[in-house]
Amino acid sequence: MWFKNLYFFAFTRPFEWSEQDLEKHLSEHLFTPLGSTEISHFGWINALGKHGDTSVHSANGNFLICARKEEKMLPASVIKDMIEEKVNLLEQEQGRGATKKEKEQFKEDITFELLPRAFSRITDTHAYISPVNNIIVINSSSRGKAEDLLALLRKVLGTLPVSSLEPDVCADETMTDWLNEKSLGGKFTLGMEAEFNALGDDGAVVRVKNQDLLSEEIKSHLDADKYVVKVALEWDESLSFILCDDLAIKRVKFFDVIHEQNDDIDSDDVIAKLDADFALMSGELNRFIIELLAEFSMKTTDLLEKD
C-alpha cells in the first residue's frame, strides 16, 4: 500500500468523474488472465487486491486504482536463433535467401509455437487520483510503466487531460543551487546522497553516498561545473526520498512517526488497516507534492486551462 517510487502528473482540466463513474468505466476493462496463445493483457484489478471487491477505493476524496499487466516472456535470442535455422533450411532446400516477408512470417509462426510454453510476468501498478489537488500519483520507478497506466486510463475514460509539470528554471539548476547556497526552503533538509553530472555529452558522473552534501569535497565538484541530477532529501520529519532532475521521486521511505499514527487499527481487520494506511499516505503525499512544487515555484493547478 505504501508507495515507494512516484511519478505525478497534473490535470489540464478538472477531473470530472465521480467515484461511481470511475468504477463503472474501469469495470468495463478488467484484467483477465492470458490464454495459451496470447502474449499480453493489461487491465484493472481490485484496488485493494484480494481484500477488496471494487476497482476504485476512495478515502478523503482520493481514488486508489490498480492496473495489472501480464506478459509472456519470449527471449529475443531464442526467437532469433530459430529464425536463422528456418532461413538456413530454406537456403539449403531452395538455394535462395529468405525475403523480408518470409522472415516476418517465420517470426510470427515461432512466436505462436512458443507462447503456450512461455513463462508469464505479472506487474501491478497502483495509482491514486486526487481531484481536489488536481494530480494523479503513480507508484512506479519506471516512467514508461507510469505512462502505460495513464494510457490505459485514457482508453477507458475516453480522455485524460494530464501533463508533466515543468519548472521555468530547470530542476537540476535549482537542485545545484541548494548545495551551492547551502540552504533549502520550506520543510526540506538535505540527506547524504547525490549524483552529479559534468557539462557536455561525454561528461563525468559522480555518485556519493553517506556523505555530508555541504562538505568541501562536494563543493569541489560544484566548483568544477558539475551539476546535481539526483539528491537525497527529507521532508517535514515524515519521509525521505531521492529527487531526480525530471521530478521523479525514488526510494520513498515513510518514517515510523507516520506509520505509528495507525497503530490503533486492529491488525486483524485488513480492510480497515488498508483503508487507514491509504488515507494517511495519500494525505501526506498530497501535502508533500504541493510543498515540493513550491520549491520550484509551481502549483498543481498551473496547467489548468483558463476559461
Curated annotation (Swiss-Prot):
Keyword terms, alphabetized: Cytoplasm, DNA recombination
Major localization class: cytoplasm
Pfam families from the UniProt entry: RdgC
Localization per record: Cytoplasm, Nucleoid
GO cellular component: bacterial nucleoid; cytoplasm
Family annotation (InterPro entries): RdgC (IPR007476)
Gene Ontology BP annotations: DNA recombination; regulation of DNA recombination
A GO molecular function held by the record: double-stranded DNA binding
HAMAP family listed in its UniProt record: RdgC
Entry function: May be involved in recombination.
Family: Belongs to the RdgC family.
Name the record gives this protein: Recombination-associated protein RdgC
Organism: Colwellia psychrerythraea (strain 34H / ATCC BAA-681)
Lineage of source species: Bacteria, Pseudomonadati, Pseudomonadota, Gammaproteobacteria, Alteromonadales
Gene label: rdgC
